[in-house]
Each structure stands twice: as C-alpha cells, then as structure tokens.
C-alpha cells in the first residue's frame, strides 16, 4: 500500500509521541478512526493494568497504551494504528509490533497498520494480512531470566 500525505502527517504525530518515551526503545503510536486521531501513546514503564492488556512485560508498549485509551472510549472498530520507533538522533527504526501486542490487537477491529521496518522504511498493511512472531527485548529478557532461575 502507498502512504498518502495524511499518512505522513499521522506518522509525524506518532514520531512526536515516541519522543516522550524514556524507555530505551522509543516508540510512539496513534489510533485514527475516520480520519481523526482518537488516541495517542508511547511506551513507558508500567507493568500492570486492571484491564489485563499489560501482561508479563517490562513496560507498557505504545500500541497497548493506545489500545487501552481506545477501550476507555469504547472505540474498538475501524482503527488504523500508526506505530513509529525513533533513535535518539531522530532516525526511524523497526517498529513492527511484537507478538504480544499483535495478539492484543486481535481483540479490536484494526483496519490497517503503518509501521517502520528494520531499514526505517514505512510499511502500510491491512491488519488481516499482518502476522508477528517478533519478541520484544523486554520479553526476551524475561525469558532469559526465567531460564536462568530454573
């Protein structure tokens, strides 16, 4: 899929959200429904939520932050997610959702995902065509710790 001028504006908004993150992997995310930004978020240190969306994790991922805000507004349909990861120098890095975020997204009717690949290229895809087995650094650290303690 080709990105439009509107997509570029939303990508910029998600990148701005990423600048707010104090986590090593600085990700920002926005949710758009019918051309309107309905939720903004970024990854931050939080390891629990009553809604169950933050599971075994070292942080609240940007996607989950946004989905929690959508849920609070009872918005669960026709959502387009823009997920951007930036370096300290402002360059785009891989922002592909991890497998845990992907599984949480399945509970929503996500229309499309826009994220960046390992080369910083913008990828736009329909959610129904997306899959992820990517593990976040936090999840890998937890797995390593569990293996060491067993």
PLM feature spans:
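General secondary-structure propensity
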Residues: 1-3, 28, 37, 48-52
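Zn2+-dependent cytidine deaminase-like catalytic core
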Residues: 39-148
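Short, basic/aromatic recognition patches
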Residues: 1-25
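Short beta-strand scaffold segments in enzyme catalytic cores
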Residues: 26-40, 114-115
